[in-house]
Curated annotation (Swiss-Prot):
Catalyzes the NADPH-dependent reduction of N-acetyl-5-glutamyl phosphate to yield N-acetyl-L-glutamate 5-semialdehyde. Its EC number is 1.2.1.38. Pathway: Amino-acid biosynthesis; L-arginine biosynthesis; N(2)-acetyl-L-ornithine from L-glutamate: step 3/4. It comes from the Bacteria. GO terms for cellular component: cytoplasm. The active site is at C155. PANTHER family: N-ACETYL-GAMMA-GLUTAMYL-PHOSPHATE REDUCTASE, CHLOROPLASTIC-RELATED, N-ACETYL-GAMMA-GLUTAMYL-PHOSPHATE REDUCTASE, CHLOROPLASTIC-RELATED-RELATED. It is an enzyme of class 1 (oxidoreductase). It is found in: Cytoplasm. SUPFAM superfamilies: Glyceraldehyde-3-phosphate dehydrogenase-like, C-terminal domain, NAD(P)-binding Rossmann-fold domains. Pfam families: Semialdhyde_dh (PF01118), Semialdhyde_dhC_1 (PF22698). This is N-acetyl-gamma-glutamyl-phosphate reductase.
Amino acid sequence: MSSSEKVSVGIVGASGYGGMQLVRLLSDHPQVELTYLGGNSSAGKPYAELYPHVGHRIKMIVEPIDLDVIASRCQVVFLGLPNGLACDLAPQLIERGCKVLDLSADYRFKDLDTYQAWYKTERTDQDTNAIAVYGLPELYRDDIRRAQLVGCPGCYVTASLLALAPLFKQGLIQPETAIIDAKSGTSGGGRQGKINLLLAEADASLGAYGVASHRHTPEIEQICSKLASQDIRVQFTPHLIPMPRGILATVYATLRDPGLVRDDLLTIYSAFYRAAPCVEVLPNGVYPQTKWACGTNLCYLGIEVDHRTGRVIVMSAIDNLLKGQSGQAVQCMNIMLGWEETAGLPQLAFYP
């Protein structure tokens, strides 16, 4: 597609934090025209009523979800709906000729039995699921380029996989030893009122949740298994921390070769991500902070080796709402349409 063409884009599920980030990114994208905002409970409301701070730029009304209307106005559609809803809409939008990017979990799994077991949702869209491409550009850029439907990864998954991918792909670790300790800001829980996300509950507190049962676990394992060409199980524990946005995932694993040093791994990671404009491999002894990634589509990776234990430690920092969600979806759209991969994506953080 010509870089001079403006492509018409719509967002279904524009009222949540992910939808809001899409509105922000797409309204500033040089090659996009935002032509539709859709929702259920928010239908009929001016978007500025939901987010008053964008009223000077966004004059659109949130409309009911009507597939014929969407297809008539939009060449590309982002689905920012709760799990279990995109699988009803995506097949119909694809039939109508739209390119679709789904931010939910519906099209992340090639094995629908795994999805149904973890998300408790029956699926009848096997043919559509078969054409879905996993939306992690650093691993599947060529597939995304040819895709009609992209299932965008989860936020924890993105941070974890970018830390783990070189280790599994290059066979650098004992595969059964991978442990992921991840921490996320409260925006990962969405915009709906939840007791654990109240300021009085979350502030000045830190706690684990979804221990040994978080839904992102099988998603991480699916991709790690492909990279390692064997069945992989990981230990993944997420934590909620009292800040609005950001994820720090710290990965631990036992090295196959205890003689590897930090410089070796930095060389391997730098080579692995040499064509990845949204991944920054940090130099010797520099470890990432979530604030560095805030408001950007970047992932910062820091690497260390503990020779006492024979383990590699990889730290991965992202903005959960951007590289972990909406920014990565826009990155995938850019690739699908043959544009510069970073078009419309901020490269410098909100700082401090």
